[in-house]
């Protein structure tokens, strides 16, 4: 397998907290898929949940080589977790088109968070 894209993003959790304080759920609705939105509403650490999802989606958009633009939206990426909490990624719409163009057959996601930051790396391979 060959790496066809890699992206990393780091998010200052305090910045996400400030946006949520100012605008309520607007940011969450802009970046979360419907399934993520349901999880978000039941989560006990809303800001941390949102910051981690944001970091993964930014990293994934960078791995596709585009960033969030030209028809690519945060909601076209969905972060899922297995029973042990290991993150994975589902793609929709334009994200699928771009991944297919690159010949993506495998995806890897790593996610870390500490007190002030959330960091994610996404690798696409073929």
UniProtKB/Swiss-Prot annotation:
* Gene Ontology terms: biological process: fatty acid biosynthetic process
Record's protein name: Holo-[acyl-carrier-protein] synthase
Q: Which reaction does it catalyse?
A: apo-[ACP] + CoA = holo-[ACP] + adenosine 3',5'-bisphosphate + H(+)
User: At which positions is Mg(2+) bound?
Assistant: 9, 58
- Give the protein's biological function: Transfers the 4'-phosphopantetheine moiety from coenzyme A to a Ser of acyl-carrier-protein.
| Example GO molecular function | holo-[acyl-carrier-protein] synthase activity
Q: What does this protein need as cofactor?
A: Mg(2+)
- Keyword Iron listed? The answer is no
- Which cellular component terms (GO) are annotated to the entry? cytoplasm
Q: Which Gene3D superfamilies match?
A: 4'-phosphopantetheinyl transferase domain
* Record keyword Ubl conjugation present: no
Keywords, sorted A to Z: Cytoplasm, Fatty acid biosynthesis, Fatty acid metabolism, Lipid biosynthesis, Lipid metabolism, Magnesium, Metal-binding, Transferase
Question: Which family does this protein fall into?
Answer: Belongs to the P-Pant transferase superfamily. AcpS family.
